[in-house]
């Protein structure tokens, strides 16, 4: 079984709860902001903890270090989707994540000119699936085309600058929306009254 959040990107949710369930993989959905509750779901069949560092679209922020420490006590690897927070602003490896997945179509590409994804295995767990991974890469392909790699390299050159401008614009917009009377709630972690603000820092 896989333990993960109730709040996930739609395609990830579908993969875990529909596609993988056909192959006998149970997905245990829970509130990843409650580490004790997550730990109670761990059993002998738990193969990994999957998390989004900041959930999409709810924008819940999880305590990555606390979750990885708990998972590692039980010998469980942690896979983290860090797409929504660029790696220039966040280091999953330093917080104990074992495998990081990133949709490079988003921030890295930058100009919506290419599709791509990254899987970064930090080599902390002797995954029994290495043989299966090699077979999958052989059958499905493991490399970007040169054109896609080139387009994404161009995006990398401006990633940090683009992210800083986007973050400043998002904060300014969130603050402005807070002043408009018809709007009753603004869910943005950059706002100091957001319940995840301190954790997101």
Language-model region placement:
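Active-site-lining helix/loop region of Rossmann-like oxidoreductase modules
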Residues: 201
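Conserved PLP-enzyme active-site core in the AAT-like
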Residues: 1-182, 187, 192-193, 198
């Amino acid at each position: 079984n896989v333990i993960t959040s109730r709040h996930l990107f739609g395609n990830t949710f579908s993969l875990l709860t529909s596609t993988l369930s056909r192959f006998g993989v149970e997905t245990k959905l829970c509130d990843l902001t409650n580490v004790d509750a997550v730990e109670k779901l761990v059993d002998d069949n738990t193969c990994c903890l999957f998390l989004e560092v900041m959930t999409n679209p709810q924008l819940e922020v999880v305590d990555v270090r606390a979750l990885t420490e708990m998972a590692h006590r039980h010998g469980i690897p942690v896979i983290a989707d860090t797409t929504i927070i660029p790696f220039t602003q966040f280091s999953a490896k330093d917080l104990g994540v074992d495998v990081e997945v990133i949709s490079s179509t988003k921030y890295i590409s930058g100009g919506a000119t290419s599709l791509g994804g990254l899987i970064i295995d930090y080599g902390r767990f002797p995954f029994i699936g290495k043989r299966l991974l090699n077979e999958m890469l052989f059958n499905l392909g493991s490399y970007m085309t040169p054109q896609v790699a080139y387009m994404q390299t161009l995006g990398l050159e401006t990633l940090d600058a683009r992210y800083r401008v986007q973050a400043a614009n998002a904060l300014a917009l969130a603050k402005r929306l807070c002043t408009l009377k018809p709007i009753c709630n603004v869910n943005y972690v950059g706002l100091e009254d957001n319940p995840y603000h301190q954790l997101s820092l």
